[in-house]
């Protein structure tokens, strides 16, 4: 009888642990998903800024022996 109660208590403790672990895993999964979405957005933003910078560099011609404006 004591063994049955001990076994029942151990099973109940394991079930509670499993429930908490499932909750923790779900919370971590949500955090990872949010982080990946942010990483994707930042990656797209960096690519767009790199394109804009490349376009700006090609559209500005280098001065060919121009005098500075103070002359």
UniProtKB/Swiss-Prot annotation:
Q: Which Pfam families match?
A: SlyX
Known InterPro entries for this protein?
Answer: SlyX
* Xref: HAMAP family: SlyX
Q: Which family does it belong to?
A: Belongs to the SlyX family.
* PANTHER family, A to Z: PROTEIN SLYX (PTHR36508:SF1)
| Protein name according to UniProt | Protein SlyX homolog
The scientific name of the source species is Rhodopseudomonas palustris (strain HaA2)
């Amino acid at each position: 009888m004591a063994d049955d109660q001990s076994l029942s208590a151990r099973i109940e403790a394991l079930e509670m642990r499993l429930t908490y672990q499932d909750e923790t895993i779900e919370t971590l999964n949500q955090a990872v998903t949010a982080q990946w979405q942010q990483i994707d957005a930042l990656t797209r933003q960096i690519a767009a800024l790199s394109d804009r910078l490349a376009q700006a560099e090609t559209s500005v011609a280098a001065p060919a022996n121009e005098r500075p404006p103070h002359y």
